[in-house]
Curated annotation (Swiss-Prot):
Function: Binds directly to 23S rRNA. The L1 stalk is quite mobile in the ribosome, and is involved in E site tRNA release.
Keywords linked to the UniProt accession: Repressor, Ribonucleoprotein, Ribosomal protein, RNA-binding, rRNA-binding, Translation regulation, tRNA-binding
Any one cellular-component term (Gene Ontology): large ribosomal subunit
Protein name: Large ribosomal subunit protein uL1
Highest taxon above the source species: Bacteria
GO MF annotations in UniProt: rRNA binding; structural constituent of ribosome; tRNA binding
Family assignment from sequence similarity: Belongs to the universal ribosomal protein uL1 family.
Encoding gene, per UniProt annotation: rplA
Gene Ontology BP, a term: translation
Organism name: Limosilactobacillus fermentum (strain NBRC 3956 / LMG 18251) (Lactobacillus fermentum)
Pfam families cross-referenced by the UniProt entry: Ribosomal_L1
Amino acid sequence: MAKKRGKKYQDALKKVDSKKEYAVDDAVDLVKEIDFANFDATVEVAFNLNVDTKQADQQLRGAIVLPNGTGKDQTVIVFAKGENAKAAQEAGADFVGDQDLVEKIQDGWLDFDVAIATPDMMPQVGRLGRVLGPKGLMPNPKTGTVTMDVAKAVSDAKAGQVTYRTDRDGNVAVPFGKVSFDTAKLVENLKTIEDVVVKARPAAVRGTYIKHASIASTFGPSVTLDLTTF
């Protein structure tokens, strides 16, 4: 049985026309208006794409640096040695190490948001796949987190980089800021994400690519977007 939503959610839902597709600016304004969380809630966009995720070339994955950040301070760790470790520290990484950092995570430590590694560290980091993989923390070249340019990777992560990937049903969900952000900043972040998703369209896709898009705050109801207003 589906869980019944509370009164605050129901009151918020009454303000949303479920049959309407809202212009991007209006949708952001509405999500901000109907948010009822007692904290600065995250705002997320969800796209449903016309892709066949059984085909490797139609599985989208990547990273986006949002122009206005996410509103969240990211704890960043880097697996690196020597000069690369020094570069990571100078770029502002919170924790830098090699085998010692691997062992720390094997012992159960997971107090971080982004993990970055140099390619030479991946044989050791690969042992953490069962721990980091399910949490979306495993370094990956597609998201720019397996790289020799650790300084840039750290800077991007600290600046508000978000990652995206399709689930098996072709959905992509990406956070793009906080309810407290100005509408203009949320809209700019949202349009940046939409632009990246559109450019990542697989060549094999025919017909409509983005079938549906909506935004919502952490606990709030979703608001459907008019895709022609991006």
